[in-house]
């Protein structure tokens, strides 16, 4: 059984993943896969450098993720170019990791922030959505990334609204409350997995 985890930006996916890992389950983290592919010499690093030139690199040749983010979020054409380049490479890498893990794990998870946007729904037997309302999401993103309201709204707008993700979810984990409530919901869902009725 493969379970997809998703949610909006700053919805609390990282906390959910920590609880799942602590319970002994394997989680493929799409953001980490992307990070690795963007390391100097990686497939995405080379593809992005080819598309945008050396202006997206730091003095030491590493990818300047902050500069790249600014370029993408401020220019829809750059975002479209980057997405077209990255999505295929990322999909291939995630598929390889999924197939490898499926050989040894009966149940595992994949944390994919843009799961619905990129059409990964068919990969999963179940999808867990980490949900927060719009106001909570905005406040958490501003605090976490030290962004002003305008920049935070811009980042949120680059994803499918979280309300539109709900119909795809087999489980909605509500993270509008405190940490303890969130953890209890995840533990309860994991218990149901281990002891299906």
Swiss-Prot record:
Keyword Coiled coil set for record: no
Pathway: Cofactor biosynthesis; coenzyme A biosynthesis; CoA from (R)-pantothenate: step 5/5
Range of residues in the leader sequence: none
Key words, A-Z: ATP-binding, Coenzyme A biosynthesis, Cytoplasm, Kinase, Nucleotide-binding, Transferase
Ranges where the DPCK domain occurs: 2-197
Enzyme Commission numbers on file: 2.7.1.24
Catalysed reactions, as listed in the record: 3'-dephospho-CoA + ATP = ADP + CoA + H(+)
GO cellular component labels: cytoplasm
Disulfide bonds: none
GO biological process: coenzyme A biosynthetic process
Function: Catalyzes the phosphorylation of the 3'-hydroxyl group of dephosphocoenzyme A to form coenzyme A.
Family designation: Belongs to the CoaE family.
Name this polypeptide is given: Dephospho-CoA kinase
Source organism per UniProt: Streptococcus pyogenes serotype M3 (strain ATCC BAA-595 / MGAS315)
Record gene name: coaE
